[in-house]
């Protein structure tokens, strides 16, 4: 048995050695953490440097290509932006944080600075894209579409193609469309709405005109089609007006119909209702409970907010000529290709076999297009076959060159941009 003083010495030596070992491990761990933190900082700086000057399709491509790096390093995650945190997808969340973060450039500049406007394209089922709304704007598309459903006890409008994919918490009309649009329009309209000091480089502060979301063409209005899906269209309309569109109306951002002169006054954003919308003018111009009027003049008692204005337009049936004169004044008329072919004693099946519209079909459909234009309506044909690609492209050409359709309805923005 060892003497006590030797045991004590050995124990002290053991404690000293273990202490040195833990100290070395801790030092290595801290060093690795410091290196990792420094690497992340450098990577974040590289991403921010790369993004300078990028916009449009190049910006979209950069985010899709570098998403793992951007997400893993949380490049923009800690930025404080007015729209809060989204949880739509990894790509959407990262892109959203970049757009609405502390970067000094205005949002419209980031999105559309070098973008060529494509005025004849409608982004069908826009909400299916990886970046709803933003992707269409980066391609220069001037018309987008969102399908909406009444959810959460009729207090919210969720964006979805059908009831199976409804997500009212993360994919509502305000999260995907109205909140981003309102923020963008606030950035470029009026000194009281400026969040960025250099936004004045884009627009003249003394200009009283409302400016839109396209950097190179600030006078162009973005058309937003809202497709009513729920059976209760009256409640859908009431919620749309009072909750989602009211902030735009208060800032004069919406195109409207002057109910006294029947004149359409263009704004940065044009709202068109499609699908199962209410058709009665008594519903469209209903007076909400909180609406007030500053006068007892009968002429001031028109419109949903009793301001003599109607802020939405109906997507009128292109294939029903006799109704166009009877329905409310509007800006758009649409029909499916199948509906028009039926009117022309043909069918979609025959067209698919042939691969293009015949001369007789073109002549017949052209009459419907011309009739709509007599009422100053833009036109759109939906339900165009997407396959084979050669048929789709041929039909795109026939719509544009032979029929003079105003909006080519498509799900493929990349191909139509190169068309």
Curated annotation (Swiss-Prot):
Residues 1-31 form the signal peptide. The keyword tRNA processing does not apply. Keywords: Signal. InterPro entries: HAT_RTT109-like, PLC-like_Pdiesterase_TIM-brl. One of its GO terms (biological process) is lipid metabolic process. Transmembrane segments: none annotated. The keyword DNA repair does not apply. Disulfide bonds: none annotated. GO terms for molecular function: phosphoric diester hydrolase activity. It comes from the Eukaryota. Belongs to the AIM6 family. This is Altered inheritance of mitochondria protein 6.
